[in-house]
Amino acid sequence: MVDIFTSEFTVGESITTDPIPESDFIPNSGNLFPKFPDQIRKTAVEVWLFDAIAEDGSSAITISFFRDALAAPAGFRIAVNASWSDGTIWGKPLIFPKSLITSKGPDVGSGAVTGVWRTDEDSSSHATFEVAADLSTAKVTFDVPGKVVGTLELKSLGFHPLPRSAREAEAAPSIYWMRSIAKAAATVDMVFTSPSADGESTTERPLVIGKDENPAFGGVDRSWESVGWTQAVTDSVFLRAKSGPYDLHFMLLVGKAEQDYRLTASASLYRDGELVCAPHDVLHHTEDGITTGAAAATTTTTRGDVDTLVVKKLFEGEGLPAPFRHQNVGYQLEYTSGGPDGKTWVFETRHQRAWYRKPTGPGTGSSGFIVSVTGGEAGKGKSFQGWGYEGQVVLPE
């Protein structure tokens, strides 16, 4: 039996200041249907993220469909950021007053999900995403004349598992981040339109990724929270990368000092498609190089108990400085698997090409980079190289 579940938002009616309970987390599901299906509180955020990057780092795109109040009363936004090998970038929000999401399947956690961000009923300007019920494929389509038209298609390479519990999906208290499709082969065929410098004309530029002899990878991420980051978080770092046989993913949120919560991450490391490390606990490097357990007064995690991740900002050597408070040139990541036979893998990312830069205040904002990635298993003497993309968000402390 196939049921149809529908969540339809109109910007003037669907955002409220009242508390709105979120729907339950669904184990072993992509959790793609909205957690706030009827209305969303002004402080809450839901997002569906799709991305692709050429394996040689030459070009990339990220697309994020949002349901939140940031663009209200104009509408609900889609953040689109594209990067070409010559350093050209295209980054603009697309804003639509309506958002419709449907799930077709035996239950709300197992259906094929379609999202449509659109203008009025009779308008052809819209953007859609579609994710198969078995999470095998995803497709994003833009039909926004004068801005962007074309498609991003993803075919899953089977890099699961999905979270078995809400805690496994928590990147921070009550902030959820998961990879509905963790790794996919990607193809992009889009055309972007930009105004000329004098504003008298426009230019069009195609973005083609993952075709011919230049393969590409990407994925689908899903996040939601009832309280926005600005109230609880000072920093975040996102990475999707490939280095030889390794695929690296992580999302790290650092809370404000008064939150005093145990530092966690949504992270995974694969070798040849096999999950070898899935840290949820983070052992944090402070900026003076001292290794501590985050929220040391309450954490009991030690190396060897569980999979862990150490994240250290790099300030010396190759790389472009991040534009906001930290000005780091990359990161060192240390994945350690738990148990008596635990192994450690160490990787370095370096900012090679600036992507987007969006200031929000003194020393704060969001930025993105195409990054080189180097590393492998510690003590093995063999290092692998690859590429990925990294996003940083810096918020007031």
From Swiss-Prot:
One of its GO terms (molecular function) is isomerase activity. It is an enzyme of class 5 (isomerase). Keywords: Isomerase. Pathway: Secondary metabolite biosynthesis. Pfam families: DA_C, DA_N. It comes from the Eukaryota. Diels-Alderase; part of the gene cluster that mediates the biosynthesis of the tetramic acids Sch210971 and Sch210972, potential anti-HIV fungal natural product that contain a decalin core. The PKS module of tasS together with the enoylreductase tasC catalyze the formation of the polyketide unit which is then conjugated to 4-hydroxyl-4-methyl glutamate (HMG) by the condensation domain of the tasS NRPS module. This is Diels-Alderase tas3. It comes from Hapsidospora irregularis. The gene is tas3.
